[in-house]
């Protein structure tokens, strides 16, 4: 039997290119340098004597040969993942409990689709969200009131394992008729005379406060709301400005309710991590949920970046 050239890693690379539309972003997704990924693609093209995508296209446009390999990857990858799940069930069983605690008001936008996909493969795992917003989800883990937590910072605790989910950009939003809509980039001083609409959380959990305003001694007037849609309504009505994840703002940007602007020249970026108890490290369904959340997030949320520990 003639040996095949294509390997599983090639298919992962091609899917990353398809989903990100960029060589640099795809390289980060599969944990390669950009030159290593380009070399991998070059070897595939040389093997078959065909280009896989059009050079200098943005986003990448795949050739017919490239699209054929993408179809192959879409067929093979789910089967490999299913086989790995089956083996995990044989080893560890397929029942358990997975209670999720979050410290992020916008997490539900991407968490629910991941939970739905997970249920299809782990029907005997009791899946639930610990009700309410939590300022100490790690404490819930350690007290056995939660089994999986989403946090924005890593704590040093030998009893907890942290795994990177992704990094994302926070953008400033305001009414289309607001004076700040004329600025491409907002700096700390732009918030001085504004009403800042936030979620009702402690200051140290607000990225804009921690990373931009606090060091400048700027503390604008506040207004709080639990709901993102209520925040959008206040901003659209010129009763304040806000900072939220780009993915959370996008549906309202597309409808023209508000406009989004970059916060500082460097941008305002935040991170999210998954946390589990050290004693639960071997539970296969927890690892599969982690992989499902990452996969769903990068597939559906715009503007994410790979995050490393």
Swiss-Prot record:
Per the similarity annotation, which family is this? Answer: Belongs to the LysR transcriptional regulatory family.
Tell me the protein's name.
Answer: HTH-type transcriptional regulator MetR
Gene3D superfamilies according to UniProt: Periplasmic binding protein-like II, Winged helix-like DNA-binding domain superfamily/Winged helix DNA-binding domain
Q: What is the lineage of its organism?
A: Bacteria, Pseudomonadati, Pseudomonadota, Gammaproteobacteria, Pasteurellales
Q: Which Gene Ontology BP terms does the record give?
A: methionine biosynthetic process; regulation of DNA-templated transcription
What would you give as a GO molecular function for this chain, any one? DNA-binding transcription factor activity
According to its UniProt entry, what is the function of this protein? Control of the last step in methionine biosynthesis; MetR is a positive activator of the metA, metE and metH genes.
Which residues, as ranges, make up the DNA-binding region of this protein? 23-42
Matches recorded under InterPro entries: LysR_subst-bd, MetR_PBP2, Tscrpt_reg_HTH_LysR, WH-like_DNA-bd_sf, WH_DNA-bd_sf
Question: Where can this protein be found?
Answer: Cytoplasm
Report the residue ranges that make up the HTH lysR-type domain in this protein. Answer: 6-63
Read off the PROSITE patterns from this record: HTH_LYSR (PS50931)
Q: Which organism is it from?
A: Haemophilus influenzae (strain ATCC 51907 / DSM 11121 / KW20 / Rd)
Taken from the record, one Pfam family name reads LysR_substrate
Main subcellular location of this protein, as a coarse class: cytoplasm
Q: Which UniProt keywords apply?
A: Activator, Amino-acid biosynthesis, Cytoplasm, DNA-binding, Methionine biosynthesis, Repressor, Transcription, Transcription regulation
